[in-house]
Every structure is written in C-alpha cells, then in structure tokens.
A protein has these predicted regions:
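AAA+ P-loop NTPase nucleotide-binding core of proteostasis motors
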Residues: 1-178
Length: 178
C-alpha cells in the first residue's frame, strides 16, 4: 500500500529463503571463483534497477545472522556493495522489515492486578531479545500491529468494495452483493 500511494515500486524478499549462510551469496552475489559469480546478487541487482523503491524484507528474524551485517552497511552508509565491489545506492529506498518476533504475546492479556505491561510492550521486549542492539539502534521506528477489530475490517472491506465498484462502473459492469 505504501509503495502504491507513493507511486514507487515494491521490492519484496522473503527472508525465510535466506536462513542458511550460503544464501547470502544469492543477495549480494557469489565470491570470485564460485559458480554464479558473473550473475550478481538478487538484492544488489534489484536496488540498482529500482533505487527509488520500498524494500520489504519479510520475516527478517528468519534470515541468517550474517545478513544483518549486510543490512548494517545499508542503514549506516546507504550503500550496498556486491561481490564485484559495485555499490548500490540505497539513499532513496524505504527499508521496511517485518517480524513475527514477539507475536506469541499478541493474544496474552496482562497478568495480575498491578500489571502495567501491555501486549505491545511485551512484544517489543521479545524483539529486543531476538535482534542485536547494534541492529535495533539503527532502526527509525518499531511499529506493533495489533489484530484488526471486526469494525475496522468492515470499514476496510467497504472501502475496497467501493473502489472496485467504481472501477467496474467505468466498464459498465455493476456489482451487487447479497
């Protein structure tokens, strides 16, 4: 939605595909002498092709720990260097990372009469246990998403149905839901 509203591309990587150490080469390219050296990396190539984008790293907690070192380079210097030493300019991308770290606390109510810890705070506490401080300190913000209420889901659905109805009307098609 963000990329669409900004009129820029969304580049998405499912980080569960990068759990093993050797998969880092898929992102930035294989080292010299290895198969695929000439191919470059999926991430570095994507950033070079669309430097003005929303880069979504989905389920970041599943990525191999060495990938976080690569991301530190992006967050510190707005540059990502591939296997051949070519630099990808990251100054104009919006980096968003999703995580399910702490999700187990989403449905837990506070325990005890004097409990001051909200589910959001419990979730963020787990995030701090999952990721290293040097990684977390480079993030602009951490946003906790709570379950959508039935009322909110109805509002979203109504809006989407209105938009669909408007598009269909342009093609002289009517939509009737019962």
């Amino acid at each position: 939605v963000l990329a669409s509203e900004l009129g820029i591309s969304l580049v998405r990587f499912d980080m569960s595909e990068y759990m093993e150490k050797h998969t880092i080469a898929k992102l930035i390219g294989s080292p010299a002498g290895y198969i695929g050296y000439e191919d470059g990396g999926l991430l570095t190539d994507a950033i070079r092709k669309t430097p003005n984008c929303v880069l979504l790293l989905d389920e970041i907690e599943k990525a191999h720990p060495d990938i976080f070192n690569i991301l530190l380079q992006v967050m510190d210097y707005a540059v990502l260097t591939d296997n051949k030493g070519r630099k990808s300019d990251c100054r104009h991308l919006i980096l968003i990372m999703t995580s399910n770290a702490g999700a187990q606390y989403a449905h837990q109510a506070s325990i005890g009469f004097n409990s001051q810890v909200s589910t959001g705070q419990a979730m963020l506490r787990q995030v701090k246990k999952t990721f290293k401080p040097e990684f977390l300190n480079r993030l602009s913000a951490s946003v906790v998403f709570h379950d959508m209420s039935r009322e909110m889901a109805t509002q979203v659905l109504d809006k989407k149905l209105r938009q669909l109805d408007e598009k269909l009307a342009l093609r002289h098609v009517s939509l009737h839901l019962t």
